[in-house]
């Protein structure tokens, strides 16, 4: 697939999950460096907020906005996923008062980038994840998925959250 970064084409590899598909279990790294598996949240609905780096304005904004919304969602976990080191994620969450969303890192599992179809393969952000939102039910069935066409733009929060209403 192709998305853009400041209007320039960027190739994104892997299969991006579509509504009705099932996302297989994966393992990420929490802020305490412990493994965090998707299946750890088997009894909950999940919002996967995927982005290149928490140290960019748009990515930070998405974490803040989903954190605000997470407090209003019942039986739902918001996972904010990037390749940032857990130390950077923890620093950001502490400074910003992020308590309702959980930041997790792909730094020990780059295969996840392809598994979720967000592997940036070309351009200056190659090796990071493209911006996307995937909403899953308790059995990891995809309820909503958006691969954001322009990496510098925010996802459609309303569409993602509407499937959880």
From Swiss-Prot:
Domain of life: Bacteria
S-S bridge residues: 59-93, 59-93
Matching InterPro entries: Redoxin, Thioredoxin-like_sf, Thioredoxin_domain, TPX, Tpx_CS, Tpx_Peroxidase_subfamily
E.C. number: 1.11.1.24
Stretches assigned to the Thioredoxin domain: 17-165
Alphabetized HAMAP family for the sequence: Tpx (MF_00269)
Subunit structure: Homodimer.
Name recorded for this polypeptide: Thiol peroxidase
Source lineage: Bacteria, Pseudomonadati, Pseudomonadota, Gammaproteobacteria, Pasteurellales
Gene name in the database record: tpx
């Amino acid at each position: 697939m192709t998305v853009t970064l400041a209007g320039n084409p960027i190739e994104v590899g892997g299969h991006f999950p579509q509504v009705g598909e099932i996302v297989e279990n994966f393992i990420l790294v929490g802020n305490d460096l412990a493994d965090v598996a998707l299946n750890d949240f088997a009894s909950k609905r999940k919002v996967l907020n995927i982005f290149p780096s928490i140290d960019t304005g748009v990515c930070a904004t998405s974490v803040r906005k989903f954190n605000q919304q997470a407090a209003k969602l019942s039986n739902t976990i918001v996972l904010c996923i990037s390749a940032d080191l857990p130390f950077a994620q923890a620093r950001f969450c502490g400074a910003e008062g992020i308590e309702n969303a959980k930041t997790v890192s792909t730094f020990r599992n780059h295969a996840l980038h392809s598994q979720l179809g967000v592997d940036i393969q070309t351009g200056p952000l190659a090796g990071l994840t493209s911006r996307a939102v995937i909403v899953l039910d308790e059995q990891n069935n995809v309820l909503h998925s958006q691969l954001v066409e322009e990496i510098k733009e925010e996802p459609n929060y309303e569409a993602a959250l509407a499937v959880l209403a």
